[in-house]
Amino acid sequence: MAIAEALLFVNNRAVEHPLQFLTAVAFAVPLLYVVINEFIRASARIPGFKGPRGLPLIGNLAQIRKDAAEQYRIWSKIYGPVYQIQLGNIPVLVVNSAAAAKVLFGQNAQALSSRPEFYTFHKIVSNTAGTTIGTSPYSESLKRRRKGAASALNRPSVESYVHHLDVESKAFVAELFKYGNGGKTPVDPMAMIQRLSLSLALTLNWGVRVASQEEELFDEITEVEDKISKFRSTTGNLQDYIPILRLNPFSSNSHKAKEMRDRRDKYLSSLNRDLDDRMEKGTHKPCIQANVILDKEAKLNSEELTSISLTMLSGGLDTVTTLVAWSISLLAQRPDIQDKAAKAIQEMYSEGQPLCDPADDQKCAYVAALVRECLRYYTVLRLALPRTSIRDITYDGKVIPKGTVFFLNAWACNMDPEVWSDPDEFRPERWFEQPDAPMFTYGMGYRMCAGSLLANRELYLVFIRTLNSFRIEPTEEKIEWHPLKGNSDPTSLVAIPKKYKVRFVPKNEVSLVEALS
């Protein structure tokens, strides 16, 4: 009876005072939505875990827009190494210490083997060519792809790629010499580093090189992959966490995601078609795609094969490219590090052997330690790709339900004061003192990066050849090499350094020219 009377009253008010009624509705409906959403958001929190309270609708999104990984590290000093945040309505457990990461991602590796799906990347960017291995939820297809990638990236396979590493790293040194005019002209090395990573990825996957950064394919792939990397960010796309924003037909984010997807599909199709033509003519070179296609026992379909190729493409451009760019900026400002590296290299190779031995498997201990310290100090993927639990797990006496999203703050773990007494210092020698210390740059557990062996081998060869060929000198312009202050876009998935220029001065120009020829 009361409900009927209330409805009658509302109806009468709507008829007698339509403008007032519409105004009241326009105010009441959003308010009711916010109130109901707050109840939903509060009930979604994981019992037992502390964390910063957020704002209605958006949760903690506003607080992490500047630099999420560093903000998470700061919060860990207040709430402990594992706490929860909310991105929109989604509760997320953030892991910020090496010890906690070992328990959650090491001891519960299988339980944390899946990935969450985000609207922008999974539903828009990846709805045609599919996802990379690293961004795929757990499935039987993922297991097949991981097996295929592991076979292509294990130690014997990496050893078989030495020729390609030799060719591309030699071309890298040649470009530094060419575009730097023998040390006379300051250059931004980013394009040279990108060509190195891209050409190696294309060679391994499709059997084709990018011989010069002046090729049209170079510009297209590097631009598109850079934009797509931003769509994988866990903080840069508000519509991933606030569903109502997806209804906006004028969303520039969605339009840009679709554009990048279409452009990527175009060059993937071209690379696949050209390989098919070469295979039909019998002129193809051995590569991952061709090997799988010709392997009658392989159980990968075309979508799964593309997933492996996308993984190699994005992984090289993300990790190796960015790490080398950061490292050169540091070396230009730290001649003491260059001197130590040069002394160690010269115990094995003279300046008359600028390109060293491409088959050298990280035998120069100081250069190997330098690579590891660069990986730790810069942590180019500050937040490892997120995980989702596929079953309930218990941590610190608290039950974490199935379906919970986890962020591994690799930046905080690599800077853990419980592991290092001086985490903020750049010091390669720490890896002689603690050779078995954990490093989180490649992730941890079941979904750890499968390409770490190849990346380490490539980085070592690039470092030793560059440092034995050139003296890296700064210009008059300041280079910000600090991992926080020098980050060009803290909202991006990958921490990319701000642009800079340096001089690559040959140590022995006659020997270098002879070696490059």
Swiss-Prot record:
Which biological processes are named by the entry's GO terms?
phenylacetate catabolic process
What InterPro entries does the annotation carry?
Cyt_P450 (IPR001128), Cyt_P450_E_grp-I (IPR002401), Cyt_P450_sf (IPR036396), Cytochrome_P450_fung (IPR050364)
Keyword annotations for this protein, in alphabetical order, are: Heme, Iron, Metal-binding, Monooxygenase, NAD, Oxidoreductase
Q: Which SUPFAM superfamilies match?
A: Cytochrome P450
Q: Report if keyword Membrane is assigned.
A: no
Q: Which reaction does it catalyse?
A: 3-hydroxyphenylacetate + NADH + O2 + H(+) = homogentisate + NAD(+) + H2O; 3-hydroxyphenylacetate + NADPH + O2 + H(+) = homogentisate + NADP(+) + H2O; 3,4-dihydroxyphenylacetate + NADH + O2 + H(+) = 2,4,5-trihydroxyphenylacetate + NAD(+) + H2O; 3,4-dihydroxyphenylacetate + NADPH + O2 + H(+) = 2,4,5-trihydroxyphenylacetate + NADP(+) + H2O
Q: Where does this protein act, in terms of pathway?
A: Aromatic compound metabolism; phenylacetate degradation
Q: Which domain of life is it from?
A: Eukaryota
User: GO molecular-function annotation terms?
Assistant: 3-hydroxyphenylacetate 6-hydroxylase activity; heme binding; iron ion binding
What EC number(s) does this enzyme carry?
Answer: 1.14.13.63
Top enzyme category: oxidoreductase
Induction text: Induced by phenylacetate and all its monohydroxy- and dihydroxy-derivatives. Induced by phenylalanine and tyrosine.
Binding-site residues, heme: 449
Q: Give yes or no: UniProt keyword Lyase.
A: no
**Signal peptide boundaries:** none
- Can you tell me which family this protein belongs to? Belongs to the cytochrome P450 family.
Task: Tell me, in a sentence or two, what this protein's role is.
Answer: Catalyzes the hydroxylation of 3-hydroxyphenylacetate and 3,4-dihydroxyphenylacetate to 2,5-dihydroxyphenylacetate (homogentisate) and 2,4,5-trihydroxyphenylacetate, respectively. Both of these compounds are used as substrate by homogentisate dioxygenase in the homogentisate pathway. The homogentisate pathway is used to catabolize phenylacetate and use it as a carbon source. Can also catalyze the hydroxylation of phenylacetate to 2-hydroxyphenylacetate at low efficiency to compensate for loss of phacA.
This chain belongs to which protein, by name? 3-hydroxyphenylacetate 6-hydroxylase
Query: What taxonomic lineage is listed for the species of origin?
Result: Eukaryota, Fungi, Dikarya, Ascomycota, Pezizomycotina
